[in-house]
Amino acid sequence: MASQGTKRSYEQMETGGERQNATEIRASVGRMVGGIGRFYIQMCTELKLSDYEGRLIQNSITIERMVLSAFDERRNKYLEEHPSAGKDPKKTGGPIYRRRDGKWMRELILYDKEEIRRIWRQANNGENAAAGLTHLMIWHSNLNDATYQRTRALVRTGMDPRMCSLMQGSTLPRRSGAAGAAVKGVGTMVMELIRMIKRGINDRNFWRGENGRRTRIAYERMCNILKGKFQTAAQRAMMDQVRESRNPGNAEIEDLIFLARSALILRGSVAHKSCLPACVYGLAVASGYDFEREGYSLVGIDPFRLLQNSQVFSLIRSNENPAHKSQLVWMACHSAAFEDLRVSSFIRGTRVVPRGQLSTRGVQIASNENMETMDSSTLELRSRYWAIRTRSGGNTNQQRASAGQISVQPTFSVQRNLPFERATIMAAFTGNTEGRTSDMRTEIIKMMENARPEDVSFQGRGVFELSDEKATNPIVPSFDMSNEGSYFFGDNAEEYDN
């Protein structure tokens, strides 16, 4: 639990390690991504992919999904106990795209899960390397965050679609461990808890018996994770109430929705990590780079540097704009779906536009799409500057509330104001301050009312030149204060459906 003074850095969570010093952390994260790279190279050999085909992001995603599926114990067990027609529980596969006579062809491949597990372990010194698997899950989650909107999921749990900036990591599988929990947004945790409470309301036996005891432990653990994301005493006290409730019901759902809304201004701490597609690590390993020896960090210059030197391709549909496809993948690589566009644009060095203006659909290609008209192009994933990823949420001076635009969860530790429409947010807080959490609610509302949109977050923090790897000369950008930048305004993205 974060509040117990046992904060581990994300890299420690990511690599499952106990407390380590910076060098050890860099080495173990390096070992993790190096293992991913070695696995990818081996898979390309197995599949006889050309260099170009191996750099295709769609092929990378298929290979990543195969290894995640091969290690999904729970689902594998379920598939074996509930055999469904046409699904071999022991096999996994997906589309692989090959270049034939100037055209792209789709080939569906199937592999034994056991074989995939063997190749993965071999690439990871014989270990299961759960950290590497989680890393791939977070990359897929970041890609989903940048690609899809979760309006429907929000509405289903009684939340407001404008709270989309709280939904980081909403598509992460349950099994993503501590590293996964660290990158989940406040809204994601609230949604998981509400779903659980609703099941308890509809199913009398949900909290009962031996199973119910396990359910209860999971419920309290999720409450503690969410509590650890809040930075004000009143929000945390409300989480204690929700956690200790004998029989969670509608009152708890109300409290959770209230807390989620409050997080639009009193932002939670949510970790951000640059998780790259497996093919990027593969390219680096193939060129002789030794990640473990050199060390690697997910939150510093390393991912930027890796992307400066990697050429990755993507399939492009006939009506898509390659520059927009590049923006989508760039945002996913840096976990920047919920970042202020002013900040992202400055770092990237080219204008980053809101999703409603993108002429591109998702990266993955459905099995019924026509390959005849598919083209491919280079993804432009380079940046002008680099900046340190944050896990703080950007609230100004410690406990005081800071302004939060209705759609930002900062990714980069870079000075800016967080403009917001206080009226829009506060409108959601009329009325209900009675009940057992009334004093906490009143206190939270007071803090929110005192928040000023002109307050500066991340005071004095700047971006760095790519030659400045020790982060010695911060360049503090000046932004047009009035011009807020949410990626989700005027949104028309498709919904995420499993």
Curated annotation (Swiss-Prot):
Subcellular location field: Virion; Host nucleus
Listed SUPFAM superfamilies: flu NP-like
Oxidoreductase recorded as keyword: no
Protein name: Nucleoprotein
Region (Disordered), start-end ranges: 1-21
One GO MF term attached to the UniProt entry: structural molecule activity
Transmembrane portions of the chain: none
PTM description: Late in virus-infected cells, may be cleaved from a 56-kDa protein to a 53-kDa protein by a cellular caspase. This cleavage might be a marker for the onset of apoptosis in infected cells or have a specific function in virus host interaction.
Biological process according to GO: symbiont entry into host cell; viral penetration into host nucleus
Lineage: Viruses, Riboviria, Orthornavirae, Negarnaviricota, Polyploviricotina
Oligomer and partners: Homomultimerizes to form the nucleocapsid. May bind host exportin-1/XPO1. Binds to viral genomic RNA. Protein-RNA contacts are mediated by a combination of electrostatic interactions between positively charged residues and the phosphate backbone and planar interactions between aromatic side chains and bases.
Highest taxon, organism lineage: Viruses
